[in-house]
Amino acid sequence: MQIFVKTLTGKTITLEVESSDTIDNVKAKIQDKEGIPPDQQRLIFAGKQLEDGRTLADYNIQKESTLHLVLRLRGGAKKRKKKTYTKPKKIKHTHKKVKLAVLQFYKVDGSGKVQRLKKECPSVSCGPGTFMASHFDRHYCGKCGTTYVFKKADEE
């Protein structure tokens, strides 16, 4: 019987085969006509890839049936090189969460009176709730730059 083999280029090859022929025999005949080695050939019929050991009758391939020839691709994607960094990785700053951080701004004395530990900035541009930093010799506002310097007892 006669079957057709359609290649990727669109070229159609006619082969003279028997229904008892194996897929290996068909691939060998394609190699004789086209020069494509059998290990690179994939034959597809009715959406299924044909296995080498089976016969044409196993797949119900009759006279004047068309098989599609596809080339087998070996391997996968190219392996990527691992990146090498010239500088060591920068350590990111992590915010330290302090529970009840507001308590460091106030002190409660024995009688229950609340006393403010840090001075609040009197500047209009800062607004209420902006505290000044306490240094050993001054109070400093980081927002507006206002500075109050302490007088030493021996300077008076």
Swiss-Prot record:
Keywords: Cytoplasm, Isopeptide bond, Metal-binding, Nucleus, Ribonucleoprotein, Ribosomal protein, Zinc, Zinc-finger. In the N-terminal section; belongs to the ubiquitin family. In the C-terminal section; belongs to the eukaryotic ribosomal protein eS31 family. Gene3D superfamilies: 6.20.50.150, Phosphatidylinositol 3-kinase Catalytic Subunit, Chain A, domain 1 (3.10.20.90). It comes from the Eukaryota. Residues 1-76 form the Ubiquitin-like domain. InterPro entries: Ribosomal_eS31 (IPR002906), Ribosomal_eS31_euk-type_sf (IPR038582), Ribosomal_zn-bd (IPR011332), Ubiquitin-like_dom (IPR000626), Ubiquitin-like_domsf (IPR029071), Ubiquitin_CS (IPR019954), Ubiquitin_dom (IPR019956), Ubiquitin_ubiquitin-like (IPR050158). GO terms for molecular function: mRNA binding; structural constituent of ribosome; zinc ion binding. CDD domains: Ubl_ubiquitin. GO terms for cellular component: cytosol; cytosolic small ribosomal subunit; Golgi apparatus; nucleus; plasmodesma. This is Ubiquitin-ribosomal protein eS31z fusion protein. SUPFAM superfamilies: Ubiquitin-like, Zn-binding ribosomal proteins. There is a cross-link at residue 76 (Glycyl lysine isopeptide (Gly-Lys) (interchain with K-? in acceptor proteins)). Ubiquitin is encoded by 16 different genes. Ubiquitin is generally synthesized as a polyubiquitin precursor with tandem head to tail repeats. Often, there are one to three additional amino acids after the last repeat, removed in the mature protein. Alternatively, ubiquitin extension protein is synthesized as a single copy of ubiquitin fused to a ribosomal protein (either eL40 or eS31) or to a ubiquitin-related protein (either RUB1 or RUB2). Following translation, extension protein is cleaved from ubiquitin. GO terms for biological process: translation. A zinc finger (C4-type) spans 121-144. The keyword Transcription does not apply. It holds the Pfam family ubiquitin.
